[in-house]
Amino acid sequence: MENSRFLSCKYRSSFGSSNARRIRAKCEIPAVVYGQGNDVLHLKIKSSEFNKKFAKFTDNTVLILDDGKVERCVFVKDVAENIASKLIYHIDFYEVDKRVELEKYIPIKLVGASIGVKEGGILTVLKEQVKVRSLPLDLPEFIELDLTPVNKGDSVLLKDLVLPSNVKLAESDDNLEVVIIK
């Protein structure tokens, strides 16, 4: 498993604004984990470790919080930050069961220069994301759509998207158009 997914964490028992300031003064970030029907867990994470990885996160990035005993599969739900000072005040994580498939919208990343566009066609994007189903750790950050072979007058349907082998389309109609070149 990718090392970039792992974040070390420690449990914390002190709460409130003054305690959060003390945690941040020690170059750590207060955080909470909720979901899975469990009580809310209060954690702290090293700022340097989180900041190093944070720029690479998307809404679909699944992280593994590791306290040395238990690994928790989570998504970043919310990050409270001061944009001017680039200081992160607090993180909310949402825990999911890594053994249970889930449905999530994944962005479609367009790559390549279409033959149809080179011939003067106009590219119209009708769908920017696609609903897929997979285990959390198998979720892709994006679905790549190569436009290179698409000619003028052609369209690409949802069912034409190339998905990783462990990811399934979860849209109700796989005949919907993703892009059209007119």
UniProtKB/Swiss-Prot annotation:
Coiled coil: none
InterPro entries: Rbsml_bL25/Gln-tRNA_synth_N (IPR020056), Ribosomal_bL25/Gln-tRNA_synth (IPR011035), Ribosomal_bL25_b-dom (IPR020057), Ribosomal_bL25_C (IPR037121), Ribosomal_bL25_long (IPR001021), Ribosomal_L25_dom (IPR029751), Ribosomal_uL5_bac-type (IPR020930)
GO MF entries: 5S rRNA binding; structural constituent of ribosome
Keywords: Ribonucleoprotein, Ribosomal protein, RNA-binding, rRNA-binding
Domain of life of the source: Bacteria
GO cellular component terms listed in the entry, alphabetical order: cytosolic large ribosomal subunit
Keyword Ribosomal protein: yes
Example GO BP: translation
Family assignment from sequence similarity: Belongs to the bacterial ribosomal protein bL25 family. CTC subfamily.
Subunit structure: Part of the 50S ribosomal subunit; part of the 5S rRNA/L5/L18/L25 subcomplex. Contacts the 5S rRNA. Binds to the 5S rRNA independently of L5 and L18.
PANTHER family per record: RIBOSOMAL PROTEIN L25/GLN-TRNA SYNTHETASE, ANTI-CODON-BINDING DOMAIN-CONTAINING PROTEIN, RIBOSOMAL PROTEIN L25_GLN-TRNA SYNTHETASE, ANTI-CODON-BINDING DOMAIN-CONTAINING PROTEIN
Function: This is one of the proteins that binds to the 5S RNA in the ribosome where it forms part of the central protuberance.
Protein name as it appears in the record: Large ribosomal subunit protein bL25
Source organism of the structure: Borreliella afzelii (strain PKo)
